[in-house]
Amino acid sequence: MKQLTPRQAEVLALIRSAVQQTGMPPTRAEIASELGFKSANAAEEHLKALARKGVIRMMPGTSRGIQLLTDEPEEDEGLPLIGRVAAGEPILAQQHIETHYQIDGSLFHPRADFLLRVHGMSMKNIGILDGDLLAVHKTTQANNGQVVVARVGDDEVTVKRFERKGHIVQLLPENEELQPIVVDLTQENLSIEGLAVGVIRNGNWL
């Protein structure tokens, strides 16, 4: 199987997640909206590339005509472990993957798509410690109170609790020594990379 680009891997992860949660693949428009493409045509081009690489089959005549043929390459090896993510780069870029863990993502709810190595103690009060592996479900949507993997502008990703009121978002640490990150959505871009769905420490789920 040919190696996927980071964007193709994101599209494939989204398809797998949609099938897992709803029993059906997403439409082209849904893929474009979820991943920030300018049009459904851009999503179509990525789907054609995935079909050429043998991981999906496209069925004409239906907006949800996508059939998964094989597991995502990373799943054959386990969940990818993402180390430190450079500013402005896709979180699933190949250069960020340190290794793979033989963990079934469906054991988490919602399904885990990757693991992220935690740096720092900003979430220590809820048991997320420096060096832990955070199981993450890839999505661009978050509700108030959820722990998210987020990126402000082109900065590195951060793990914080999400709170939004109007156009103001606070990314709240669980550490009384640290201050929230306040984002005015009219002035800055905020990207949600995923939701925290579990913590692994020393090989054990917490």
Swiss-Prot record:
Indicate the residues that the entry says bind DNA: 28-48
Q: Which InterPro entries match?
A: LexA (IPR006200), LexA-like (IPR039418), LexA/Signal_pep-like_sf (IPR036286), LexA_DNA-bd_dom (IPR006199), LexA_repressor (IPR050077), Peptidase_S24_LexA (IPR006197), Peptidase_S24_S26A/B/C (IPR015927), WH-like_DNA-bd_sf (IPR036388)
What does the UniProt keyword field contain?
Answer: Autocatalytic cleavage, DNA damage, DNA repair, DNA replication, DNA-binding, Hydrolase, Repressor, SOS response, Transcription, Transcription regulation
The UniProt entry annotates the active site at S122, K160
This enzyme catalyses: Hydrolysis of Ala-|-Gly bond in repressor LexA
> Mind listing the GO biological process terms from this record?
DNA repair; DNA replication; negative regulation of DNA-templated transcription; proteolysis; SOS response
Q: Does the keyword Transcription apply?
A: yes
Please give the SUPFAM superfamilies that the UniProt record associates with this protein: LexA/Signal peptidase (SSF51306), Winged helix' DNA-binding domain (SSF46785)
Q: Which domain of life is it from?
A: Bacteria
Any Pfam family hit = Peptidase_S24
Question: What EC identifiers does the entry list?
Answer: 3.4.21.88
Q: Does the keyword Transcription apply?
A: yes
List site positions: Cleavage. Answer: A87, G88
PANTHER family listed in its UniProt record: LEXA REPRESSOR, LEXA REPRESSOR-RELATED
What is the similarity comment for this entry?
A: Belongs to the peptidase S24 family.
Q: Which HAMAP family match?
A: LexA
Q: Quote the subunit structure annotation.
A: Homodimer.
Please give the function described in this protein's UniProt entry. Represses a number of genes involved in the response to DNA damage (SOS response), including recA and lexA. In the presence of single-stranded DNA, RecA interacts with LexA causing an autocatalytic cleavage which disrupts the DNA-binding part of LexA, leading to derepression of the SOS regulon and eventually DNA repair.
* Protein's recorded name: LexA repressor
In the record, what lineage is assigned to the organism producing the protein?
Bacteria, Pseudomonadati, Pseudomonadota, Gammaproteobacteria, Aeromonadales
